[in-house]
Amino acid sequence: MKFNVNPQDYSQTYLENLNICFPNWGDMKTFDWVFNRKVTNRKADFFIINSEENELLAGSAISYRKLKFPSGNDHEIGIMTGSWTLPISRGMGCFTETIKKSVEIVQDKKVSFLTAFVTESNASYRRLRDAGSFLVDTNYIISQNLECKKLFNQIEVAVLECNYENLEAVFNLRNKLLQSKIHYDYNFDEFVNQFINRINPTFLIQLGNEFAIVEETPKMFQLHYCTSYSYEIITGIVNWVNKKNKEIIFFSTDKNNSFQNDESFKVIPGFFTILKNEVSNNVDLNSVFSSEIDFDIQYGDKM
């Protein structure tokens, strides 16, 4: 297999293949938002894989963030993003080679870890597990209340202006709430660009003393950030989006969340995977990512 890293004038072809493998993944506006924003002063890297006969097989990208720890220390991480393997090349070991190449790229940039978000049922999870990844339990959670029509306790939802004062208050509250957890670290401008300045309309909402940021996509809402994932707050948000005849998806690194056995929610188990390289070879993952320290990664952190 042959690798071409950051090929010139390849965005449109890369996007076309993403949409072949993941129908309706997005348009060029989506591509630019995912791959061409700078976060932690780095743009995403991407590469393609060709056969020895120059037949296109697969592609993948790496975006960059910082994980911050309760100690105040942080580690820069690469995140496998937008990986695809064309149907003709499945079963050829392309994703295993994608992992190896991704490790090499982040290592060359002196980035400590290569990470990924995978569902438990996906073959990508097994490849990353077998490569030696440290595994953090996650859940994708999708409301199904339009079908179940379960009546939740009502809680008032107020839509706030996305002005500087309100966003700064939520940003500062986020930093306070995450002090004791492992989380993605942003400065204020990065926070706004990550959670507010997205592709579709976003809403900053308040429920009692709690706040949430949601994005309305054509098919459903996405809950990108919330100060509380209590049953009362989440069901209040579900009621609000149901009035618009849509459901909502969110993401949790709390495996003991309240939605596991509720017919109004579909829970899809998965993992946040963390893979070392030569930069972090002496790091004991079980010590750094101690089970005594919780992760808090939310849906809006993921891309």
What are these regions (language model features)?
Residues S51-N54, E104-S112, A123, F134, ...:
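Secondary-structure boundary elements
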Residues Y64, F117-E156, A212-M303:
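Active-site/acyl-donor-binding loops of N-acyltransferases
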Residues A61-S71, H75-T98, S102:
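Long, hydrophobic/aromatic-enriched structural stretches that serve as scaffold segments
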Residues T13-A44, Q107-K109, D130-E232:
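Amide-forming acyltransferase catalytic core, primarily the GNAT-like/NAT-type
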Residues M1-E76:
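Non-cleavable N-terminal signal-anchor transmembrane helices
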Residues F31-R37, F95, F117, I293:
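Tryptophan-centric aromatic hotspots in well-structured domains and transmembrane helices
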